[in-house]
């Protein structure tokens, strides 16, 4: 398990829905919350992985365009779910999703992961 995934799972806040280490040719689901274990099929997870990794490739191009070498996190906010994508290396990342409401500690989680990522 990556250090970033460990940091997310150890974060003092809401329990993640899903945490996965995404590598350039495969992925490893590190955590699925108990109530969601039967919700996602292997096909769903593989499709999500392919979509996220294609986004990683375009994200690298976008970073060059804006003159930055890295970003701390990408976030997607849905009505009741927030998704984080923490880049860990070129074409590698950690995916984490949580139940979302206005009280979710978004900045605190990003800061904690950024601190940990800087220690590696």
Across the structure, where does each feature detected by a protein language model lie?
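Non-catalytic interaction/Regulatory regions outside core domains
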Residues: 1-120
